[in-house]
Amino acid sequence: MVESVSIYEKYFKDPKREPVLIDYVRTPIGKRRGTVVRHRGDDLVIHCYETLLNRNDFDKSVLGDSIVSCNSQIGECALDIGRNAAMGAHLPVSVPGFSVNRHCASGAQAVLSGWQAIACGAMDAVICGGIELQNKYPIMADAYVFNEELGKPLMVAPNKKILTNPEVAAKLKEFNTTLSGQINSAHVLGIHYYSKHKGISMNEFKGEYRDEFKQELDQISLLSHQKACSTYDDRAKEIEPIWCPKLDENGKPMLDENNNVAQDESLSVLTTQDEGPRPTTSIEALSKLKTIIGRKSQAFLTAGNSCPTSDGAAAQIWMTRGLAEDLGLNPRATILNFAIVGTDPVLMLDGPVRAMPEALKRANLSFDDMAFIEINEAFSSVVWSCCKELGIDWNDPRFNPWGGAIALGHPTGMTGCRLIGTNLHQLEKAGKEYAISSMCVGFGMSIATIVKNENPK
């Protein structure tokens, strides 16, 4: 039995100051034209905050910060949502707040920022989480600026100096592509890694090769829905149901006389579970969907084997082990180790290939020691590529056992927080000790986090 290495114990000496996870909760994840998007983004965070604060009895003034992640910080998700959520949840005004953005890893970054603040001694407790309303504010909505000449919003282009970065320029030339977003990268990434593992050139990727690859991607997608549909009861333990307004005949949310969401079936519906999983989907249905990018002979990505646009929020409470003991609160988990890495910004979405081995190396552990392995399903080509490179079988029962983003959705500001919290619930249910999660990140980054259950059987 190998001896695991805790990042806290390696660099800090006081066991009473080790950050511990006290509690975690999330909203159901809403789908396109679903119910969750009818809320303000900050109200979804407040819903999670209030749930945590109501079921954990302690003096809330001990909280040193409120940290909320969001990818598209626009509308009510702007204006420092970390601070606004804290005030909206009626935390003492002495509790400050800030917002963070690391694209698809934003939720994990919010948690790790809180962990780091506690570990270094800057504060004793934090409340943190993430939010995204993709069906209201699409990815990159915050990059649009109104152009007066054209009379419409235009997206601000990336700085041209990025393209002259020698490493970026070399990769753009190698893959004969442009720096033009995640869907394009998911397409190029898939062709690159499939060709690599088949021993062919990227130009040879067509015909039977393309057909075989797409079939495997659709199978990954089907597995995600099947697992998600069979684990509603497991995921229910991490979800706090939320009342969502019904729509009137004009498609407007129906609110009460005070312009608030009513907890009343005449005006609202109680959303209790994730809206995305499709129990009736099949390989036949997935295979008939139109491809969304690439020449027809090389196209394989569809709406069915990519994550859908979605909405949701999640939150956690962290504090020192000593403070938890003083307050009579039971720690549920710790972060054993983690890694934050930068990777190729052109392929962009293969970050887990570097981040997960790095986190495991730091912990002196391997995938064999992990009871559960989560890789975010932004696109099925990401899952295929990362699994092949890491030697993981996507049919392994430890892999994304409760379904992934293809079925559940990927509210980018929330997902990382959800994955850490889901690992916690998986470990508690199974009585196991370690789990790892990771995700690809826009512009080539990744975070991998190893969760350690405080109470394994």
Task: Outline where the language-model segments fall.
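Active-site pocket-shaping loop/turn-to-helix segments
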Residues: Y8-Y11, R26-E50, N54, S72-G75, ...
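Conserved N-terminal phosphate-binding loop of PLP-dependent enzymes in the Aspartate aminotransferase
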Residues: K13, G130-E132, Y137-I139, I183-V188, ...
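Phosphate/pyrophosphate-binding loops at sites that engage ATP/ADP/AMP, CoA/4′-phosphopantetheine
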Residues: E50-G64, H192-G199, K206, R210, ...
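Flexible glycine-/small-residue-enriched beta->alpha junction loops
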Residues: A125-E208
